[in-house]
């Protein structure tokens, strides 16, 4: 985190973020703005909850220095787990539990647990990022660990142009290089303004600390040999002094190269363990992994609506996720099918928030949320003989089936939040959210039975469908102590809700032997036998923060507990099981600007433990889910026009009661920049000491997929070795 020589607080509602961003951007570089990730119009100093803000300068230093977004956030946010170094942010928990990601108040998490929210926007379009930790009942399901709200750049009244170009390489191969280029133009007047941007990035091959090519992730899909395009437009219309309209539109595409793939050896020998998988060219597949998405949001705000502040937002977003071809393997380690899934989500919704102050010292925030989501998916099967002969590179479609049940989800919610200043020292906060969820599952034939029909081994099968309704009340309460103007302490309780993936939950059925070509359904997951339940999390927090001229620190002890868990089955479906689980830890950050020098230093950390209750005794939790502790540190030196920063990230060991272990590792980076007469030249050396290591996801993946889907070596995903980056950026 950066520290400036001025202390400024900005009050901001997340639904007002897009409206206020231009005003924030006009502040001088030596001012620190702090925003609230709460739906009430409060500053961080008025919040009884841990909140972090990643400012534009901090984010640009990391991104222009060559860091991928997930790596940059893990470096800057104390409670966020280290990056998977893949396309996905799967397993990147906040305080050991799932997170929600929003862009300008629009939720990117869908009911499906595909974790590509951080593969949904290019960092070039980000102005700043705010993070709120702990369960957040004001944002509905999924936010049991916390949320990340990405605030995008907006147009200014004056004409401005941005340009950025960069490259990155480890010089291990002619294919070992990434390139990026981005540009934007913005302008207008005091009544109307806008911004249009285009950002493109091309990833080449990646190599580990030993100079060997890292494996493509065929489970969550990787970024090697892929392209990313982000086109975004925003517009702001100031109707009068109190009313404003703002429009945000985006097209995003991140897709793998259509020439490079994971070679599994002739006859899929790597799956049997008789050869080593490797990345090679020659891919010829009818389905390429990637992410496509569209976003449009229209927001209306009125700061003088019947004596209240009103913000209304309507939005639409869609995404199409395609996965890498993956084998189906029998007990004899023979590949019986080779296929790839595509999962599509369409979502629209609205948010209405009103803030009022009925009397001095009393604030009320209330509102309504509504959204609807449609999910469909399919599985494309490839000619097995051709795929086998080519090691999984020549993939020609032969038929397509459904992958998970299609479904519609409707959410309706009402919330009320209030804050009352008891006196000059204490503020009491509290609120409630009521949420109604309806899941309607379409008729669905079991996935394995669809394969039999597609392969001609059966002609028909029974289908099943489901309709379920969920109702939840979620509460929060907090007490804030204003010790001094720059210093606060707080005690907080909040509830969050994790909603299981309906497709994976209901997509199971037991069928009998075919009768005249028809497969009869004998048993399935149904509402009466196994009602879909949410996992409610109770979260407690005791914290303290201090923001001074040279020192900024925030520390919190936290504890969360739940009595159910979502667990993955061997067939990649899920179940909700009784499982009393608790997570507790201490998280914090200290940043210090050494007076009368150009030096600064800082550290952030998250030390936690995850346990489940087994036969009345608390035991270490499964390492497939339990988050490791983490610490980062930096030393900065910024004599004008230079800026240099050495930083480290450490993920610590974590083990479970079954004896499994995820090994920790430390990486060190050097980031720097030089201010030219026109523009800025940034440079970096990532993984400075060329550390050879397996990522956290690379150690977890074998526990999910091996030996059932091949040897552990097939899922040994390494981190990238030493890489050098160079970037030029200019704003004029």
Swiss-Prot record:
Name its species. Escherichia coli
What is the protein name for this chain? Ferric aerobactin receptor
Q: Cellular component GO terms, alphabetically?
A: cell outer membrane
Q: Where is the signal peptide?
A: 1-25
Keyword list, A-Z: Cell outer membrane, Ion transport, Iron, Iron transport, Membrane, Plasmid, Receptor, Signal, TonB box, Transmembrane, Transmembrane beta strand, Transport
Q: Where is this motif: TonB box?
A: 31-38
Q: Which PROSITE patterns match?
A: TONB_DEPENDENT_REC_1 (PS00430), TONB_DEPENDENT_REC_2 (PS01156), TONB_DEPENDENT_REC_3 (PS52016)
Q: Where is this motif: TonB C-terminal box?
A: 715-732
| Induction remarks | Under iron starvation.
Domain (TBDR beta-barrel) spans 158-732
Q: How does it sit in the membrane?
A: Multi-pass membrane protein
Checking InterPro entries in the record gives: Plug_dom, Plug_dom_sf, TonB-dep_rcpt-like, TonB-dep_rcpt_b-brl, TonB_box_CS, TonB_rcpt_b-brl_sf, TonB_rcpt_CS, TonB_sidphr_rcpt
Classification via Gene3D superfamilies? TonB-dependent receptor, beta-barrel domain, TonB-dependent receptor, plug domain
The family database entries (PANTHER family) matched by this protein are listed as:
FERRIC AEROBACTIN RECEPTOR, TONB-DEPENDENT OUTER MEMBRANE RECEPTOR
Top-rank taxon of the source lineage equals Bacteria
The keyword Iron is assigned to this record: yes
GO molecular function terms listed in the Swiss-Prot or TrEMBL record: siderophore uptake transmembrane transporter activity; signaling receptor activity
Homology family: Belongs to the TonB-dependent receptor family.
Localization per Swiss-Prot or TrEMBL? Cell outer membrane
According to the entry, every stretch annotated as the TBDR plug domain falls at 43-153
> GO annotations under biological process?
aerobactin transport
């Amino acid at each position: 985190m950066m520290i400036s020589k001025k202390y400024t607080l900005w009050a901001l509602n997340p639904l007002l973020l897009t409206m206020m961003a231009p005003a924030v951007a006009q502040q001088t570089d030596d001012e620190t703005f702090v925003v609230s990730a709460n739906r009430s119009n409060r500053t961080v100093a008025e919040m009884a909850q841990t909140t972090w803000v990643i400012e534009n300068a901090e984010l640009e230093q990391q991104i222009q220095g060559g860091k991928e977004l997930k790596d940059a956030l893990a470096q800057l946010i104390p409670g966020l787990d280290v990056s998977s170094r893949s396309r996905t942010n799967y397993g990147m928990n906040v305080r050991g539990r799932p997170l929600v990601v929003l862009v300008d108040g629009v939720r990117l998490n869908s009911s499906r647990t595909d974790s590509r929210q951080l593969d949904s926007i290019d960092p070039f379009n980000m102005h700043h990022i705010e993070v709120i930790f702990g369960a957040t009942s004001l944002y509905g399901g999924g936010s049991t660990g916390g949320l990340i709200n990405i605030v995008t750049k907006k147009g200014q009244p004056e004409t401005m142009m941005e340009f950025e170009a960069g490259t990155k390489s480890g010089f291990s191969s002619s294919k070992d290089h990434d390139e990026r280029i981005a540009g934007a133009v913005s302008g207008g007047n005091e009544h109307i303004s806008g911004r249009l941007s285009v950002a493109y990035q091309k990833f080449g091959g990646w190599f580990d600390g030993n100079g060997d090519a890292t494996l493509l992730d065929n489970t969550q899909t990787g970024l090697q040999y892929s392209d990313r395009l982000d086109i975004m437009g925003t517009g702001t219309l100031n109707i009068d002094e109190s009313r404003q309209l703002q429009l945000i539109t985006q097209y995003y595409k991140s897709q793998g190269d259509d020439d490079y793939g994971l070679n599994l050896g002739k006859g899929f020998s790597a799956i049997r363990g008789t050869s080593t998988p490797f990345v090679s060219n020659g891919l010829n597949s009818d389905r390429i992994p990637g992410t496509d998405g569209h976003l449009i949001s229209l927001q209306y705000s009125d700061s003088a609506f019947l004596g209240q502040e009103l913000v209304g937002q309507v939005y639409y977003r869609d995404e199409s996720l395609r996965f890498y071809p993956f084998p189906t393997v029998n007990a004899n380690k023979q590949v019986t099918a080779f296929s790839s899934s595509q999962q599509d989500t369409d979502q629209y919704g609205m948010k209405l928030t009103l803030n009022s102050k009925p009397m001095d010292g009393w604030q009320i925030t209330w509102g309504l949320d509504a959204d609807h989501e449609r999910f469909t998916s399919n599985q494309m099967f490839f000619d097995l003989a051709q795929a086998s002969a080519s090691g999984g590179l020549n993939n020609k479609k032969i038929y397509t089936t459904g992958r998970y049940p299609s479904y519609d989800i409707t959410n309706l919610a009402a919330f009320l939040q209030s804050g009352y200043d008891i006196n000059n020292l204490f503020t009491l906060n509290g609120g409630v959210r009521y949420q109604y969820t309806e899941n309607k599952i379409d008729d669905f034939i079991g996935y394995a039975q669809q394969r039999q029909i597609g392969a001609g081994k059966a002609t028909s099968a029974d289908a099943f469908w489901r309709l379920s309704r969920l109702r939840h009340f979620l509460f929060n309460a907090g007490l804030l102590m204003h010790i001094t103007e720059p210093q606060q302490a707080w005690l907080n309780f909040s509830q969050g809700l994790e909603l299981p993936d309906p497709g994976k939950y209901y997509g199971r059925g037991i069928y009998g032997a075919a009768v005249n070509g028809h497969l009869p359904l004998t048993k399935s997951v149904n509402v009466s036998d196994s009602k879909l339940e949410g996992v409610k999390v109770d979260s407690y927090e005791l914290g303290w923060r201090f923001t001074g001229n040279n020192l900024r620190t925030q520390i919190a002890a936290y504890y969360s507990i739940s009595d159910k868990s979502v667990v993955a089955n061997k067939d990649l479906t899920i179940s909700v099981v009784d499982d009393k689980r608790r997570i507790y830890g201490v998280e914090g950050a200290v940043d210090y600007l050494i007076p009368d020098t150009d030096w600064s230093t800082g550290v952030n950390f998250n030390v936690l433990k995850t346990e489940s209750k087994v036969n009345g005794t608390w035991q270490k939790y499964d390492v497939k889910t339990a988050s490791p502790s983490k610490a980062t540190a930096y030393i900065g030196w910024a004599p004008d026009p230079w800026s240099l920063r050495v930083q480290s990230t450490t993920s610590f060991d974590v083990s479970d009661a079954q004896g499994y272990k995820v090994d920790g590792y430390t990486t060190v980076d050097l980031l720097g920049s030089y201010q030219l007469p026109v523009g800025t030249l940034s440079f970096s050396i990532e993984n400075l000491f060329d550390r050879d290591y397996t990522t956290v996801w690379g150690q977890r993946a074998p526990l999910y997929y091996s030996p059932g889907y091949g040897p552990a070596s097939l899922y040994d995903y390494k981190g990238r070795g030493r890489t050098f980056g160079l970037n030029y950026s200019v704003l004029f």
